[in-house]
Amino acid sequence: MFTVIVDDLVFADGSTRMGVLGGGGPQTAFGFRTHPGNFSVGLAAGIGPDFPRECEDWLDANGVDSEGLMLVRDDDMDTYGAAEREGGGGEASASAFVARRERKKLDEKKDAPDAQTFRPTPRAWQITERDGRRTQVWRTPANAGLYAMLRPPAETLPPRYRGARAFHVGVHPERPDAALLASLRRSLGGGDARLGASKAGWLSVEPFTRATRPVPRETLEALCSAGDVFSPNELEAVSLVGKGSPLELCRRLAAAGAKIVCVRRGAKGAVAHDAETGETWRVPAFFSEDQSGALADVTGCGNAFCGGFIAGLASGESLDRAACWGSAAASVVAEHVGVPAAPAGDAGTREEVRRRFEALLRRTEKIVGDT
């Protein structure tokens, strides 16, 4: 899982919640960890020495490995505009990333070139409107170095992360990190016999925003075909292939090279499609029947869905079951401001997610023809 941002939340009623762990990676990890497969999960991202202790504690409590969270030397002063022109969303040499355990050694080298300050942890305002629209405003200076922190080069991954059973990455649809995705594809599986002879592992790709302008066909095909799973929300899908029904969106994305497509629709659930078999499922969103599960904050729900979905696929489950795991995990995140306090791996959390999964599975519909 990639990307960590510390969010400062501003709600439509004027209330705020500061210093919340976010960025997509933690929420995806939460969704992944709610699955009964009890997978080990790690995060890869650049953080600063100011990374809040509370955020570190949450990762520990949820069984999320943090070795992949690395410090980044503050030696790249490129502007955001430069990052845009280069088209990579911000790139940095792997040598700029420093394992946190190495920081003390660097601090002791007072006169050495490495004895530099480190970039701060990525931090942003997340402003939610009454109609559900959310606007992100960077508090950390937006430059090439910041974007590199969100998706570090593959060569910075700890050795035990390489050969993982699955990777999940958020990318900009206009500037997909082709080099990173290709590197992760080569790393998948690591010879894990549990995956079977036909499947080395799963690479899941999620756009983290809508396209602001038409995407060239070549870029669209590179984006859709880079992974095994392509999971945009409905607005993101429309920005890529135009308006249409969820089934039409899935088919257009599949025609662009996506193998498994899952179009997430918020309160309307999701539609999942397998391009090879033509199988398509409509999965509802879960809503609690009592007030104990009132909607609190939808930030990160899509990420949690992706985590549960890819965990189901990595376990060898069918497309509809995997999508139900995703929807169940997303519903838990929606009932909390920020990441849930109760750890994903707790028996109580997993039992609640399983209960929701079973309820969703009974209501899931197979789409036949053009309906």
Language model features: what each stretch is:
Residues 32, 233, 302:
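Short, conserved phosphate/pyrophosphate- and ester-handling motifs at nucleotide-, phospho-/glycolipid
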Residues 30, 124-127, 269-272:
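Short beta-strand scaffold segments in enzyme catalytic cores
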Residues 189, 216, 246-371:
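Conserved phosphate-binding/catalytic region of the ribokinase-like
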